[in-house]
Amino acid sequence: MINRRQVLQGIGAGAGALSVNGVLATSAGNRGFTHGVASGDPLSDRVILWSRYVPGGNVARAENIIWQVAYDRAFGDIAASGMTSTHRHRDFTIKVDVTGLKSGRRYFYRFVIDGHRSETGSTKTLPVGAVDRFRLGVASCSNYPQGYFHAYDDMAKSDLDLVLHLGDYIYEYARGRYVNPIAE
């Protein structure tokens, strides 16, 4: 049987191996972007982009946050870009309504501030008129200890036109009453 100390030692050794391969160095590049990125409310010519940037120290405002939307993952062909800011009263969340996009097209997006980049997200505008095929992913009720989060990974790897998240789980169990004891 493996004990807690062995697991923690294994994690420490694994983290050292990751930094050799550059994975942790990449993560350090997005310092401050603690909640990833998201997109939503797509129309045929626009989409909302979201992220959260947490500046260090006792800062009230984060300015000069660059947002970029590109046709390619490498951001060699920029479709739209701009600058925005956020502040403590918004919990440092960033929300941008990107307009002037082409319909039915996949885009890649990110946020940049002081040399730190967010993760790269992927979004798609809605098509205009009738389409031969429209692939929809649907998710709901995400109870972390009950798992099955690999389904989100499968959706991310699929060529979906839209992902609709219907809501989240209502955690109605009393303490000590979870279906899975790992939840405690």
Predicted regions and their residues:
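N-terminal secretory signal peptides and thylakoid transit peptides that target proteins
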Residues: 1-15
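Generic signature of intrinsically disordered, low-complexity, basic-rich segments
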Residues: 9-13, 21, 35, 75-76
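Divalent metal-dependent phosphoesterase catalytic cores across multiple superfamilies
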Residues: 28-184
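Bacterial Sec-dependent signal peptides at the C-terminal "C-region" and cleavage site
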Residues: 18-31
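Residue-level detector of intrinsically disordered, flexible termini
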Residues: 12-16, 24, 79, 84
